[in-house]
């Protein structure tokens, strides 16, 4: 999985929900998830910056895949990249299921009630078989 890459695009409405699209085999599904929160002034905060990012599965020194479940937050981590002028920006975001820690930076809602179910859903997203969480388009 370390060499796989996906493109992710984030757009937000006034309530902080991201407009998402999963493209798999030429079929498109529409969906949305909460990717930020709204402060008292009505501004979107704690969100991933709008625009296109590149998500890449990578390994950590233990050779364990980086997309692993955090026990307390019940989430997973990915590394996002995007071109900023002549350089690349890189950042990691914690992604957790709905009901975990809403409003934290980089929160992407993934519906899951327990760790095994969440892992299955993550696998489905990365395999292009689910319509949840992120705009994902597999890069060949």
Regions found by a protein language model. Name each.
Residues 1-105, 115-140:
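Cell wall/extracellular polymer interaction/catalysis modules
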Residues 109-110:
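Beta-rich, blade/repeat-based domains predominating
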């Amino acid at each position: 999985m370390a060499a796989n890459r996906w493109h992710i695009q984030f757009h937000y409405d006034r309530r902080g929900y991201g407009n998402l699209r999963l493209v798999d085999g030429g079929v498109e599904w529409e969906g949305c998830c909460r990717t930020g929160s709204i402060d008292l002034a009505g501004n979107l905060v704690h969100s991933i910056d709008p625009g296109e990012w590149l998500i890449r599965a990578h390994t950590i020194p233990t050779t364990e895949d980086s997309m692993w479940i955090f026990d307390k937050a019940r989430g997973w981590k990915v590394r996002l990249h995007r071109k900023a002028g002549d350089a690349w920006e890189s950042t990691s975001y914690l992604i957790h299921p709905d009901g975990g820690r809403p409003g934290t930076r980089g929160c992407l809602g993934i519906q899951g009630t327990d760790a095994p179910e969440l892992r299955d859903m993550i696998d489905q997203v990365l395999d292009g078989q689910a319509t949840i969480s992120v705009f994902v388009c597999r890069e060949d």
